[in-house]
Amino acid sequence: MQLRLSSGNVLNEKVHKVGIIALGSFLENHGAVLPIDTDIKIASYIALKASILTGAKFLGVVIPSTEYEYVKHGIHNKPEEVYSYMRFLINEGKKIGVEKFLIVNCHGGNILVESFLKDLEYEFDIKVEMINITFTHASTEEVSVGYIIGIAKADEETLKEHNNFEKYPEVGMVGLKEARENNKAIDKEAKVVKRFGVKLDKKLGEKILNNAIEKVVEKIKEMIR
Amino acid sequence: MQLRLSSGNVLNEKVHKVGIIALGSFLENHGAVLPIDTDIKIASYIALKASILTGAKFLGVVIPSTEYEYVKHGIHNKPEEVYSYMRFLINEGKKIGVEKFLIVNCHGGNILVESFLKDLEYEFDIKVEMINITFTHASTEEVSVGYIIGIAKADEETLKEHNNFEKYPEVGMVGLKEARENNKAIDKEAKVVKRFGVKLDKKLGEKILNNAIEKVVEKIKEMIR
């Protein structure tokens, strides 16, 4: 069966060898404004949009996610479980002709699996790259991107509630003491959020989202050069 | 870890028990205007959008697809392979609290797996439903929906090319002799396409897409009543 690789809105015939996978987290508190599956919803949105714009294959999502021990704001898995799920998707993706895999990751803790990517490349004789699109947790950037995608409940009252760091310590990780003690970058971000609070900035959300999609599209173009 | 189930744009706390899965096909000719992964791209778009609008979990896509023996316009798998992939996704979905699975299917041939849904329900003690959103193959409806989503190359010249049923027998299945002989419904549709041709109707595409998303959203609401 000869497939029509140049049909439709596709960059070129080679793009059919590229598979995009969304990675985030499903069970993670994000204050009042954002849902617990914020990270995977943002990752899925960006991954699918970039696939539509280029013709690359959208292979779905990785369900498990992982996190640093000292960050306690959700339910996560061991890095090995994320790795094992990736193995499954790559194995299935190879069956439909994918040779280059691009993982769009929108949850900071998943950076812990980057060390596995070389093993995947070696085992399956493929190319795997990961793009990390992450934000200060549940803060102005993520709230604004979430709003543009449609997952945020960002009325004035809920936003006010969201800024109650006592009640929602995960927001900006302001109230995650152990995380702040163990990670300087987290502590620095928390200080900024505590001082300036979390706002909804629709223009910012749009800009960040478009830049993120553009970044993935550029990476896909690079992968088929 | 207490998860904030009512946070964000979610119908209610129960919606977190609903998982949406996209099912289509990745390797199937769709004339000149549409790409070979049209069905899974449309299914993914509808499934993700409905998940965003309701708060249901988007669990990704099923990579294998199946087809009737007599329809030869792509590369497909046995129904059992689709079933086995669904088993994997359901097993993983249960781990994050999903109890009700909704499969958004945009490839007619996958109706062959409907007989497996009861087995899945029995094996995993869960609820599985499938919504079929299918069109006359690569014809006006699908071209128009594909255009709205962004996967179509629908300039005048390509559309003209698309209507060359000699060169693209799969369009409307006009030139798929075996399929038309074996299936009256396919034959009937092929006659209509042969007579009226394939056009781009942006308004129609928008209307069909919105209705499809609405249909999935209503089914999700029903599943959490």
Curated annotation (Swiss-Prot), chains A, B:
One of its GO terms (biological process) is riboflavin biosynthetic process. Fe cation 1 binds at residues 28, 39, 107. Fe cation 2 binds at residues 30, 39. The gene is arfB. Gene3D superfamilies: Creatininase. The lineage of its organism: Archaea, Methanobacteriati, Methanobacteriota, Methanomada group, Methanococci. Keywords: Hydrolase, Iron, Metal-binding, Zinc. This is 2-amino-5-formylamino-6-ribosylaminopyrimidin-4(3H)-one 5'-monophosphate deformylase. Requires one Fe(2+) ion for activity. Homodimer.
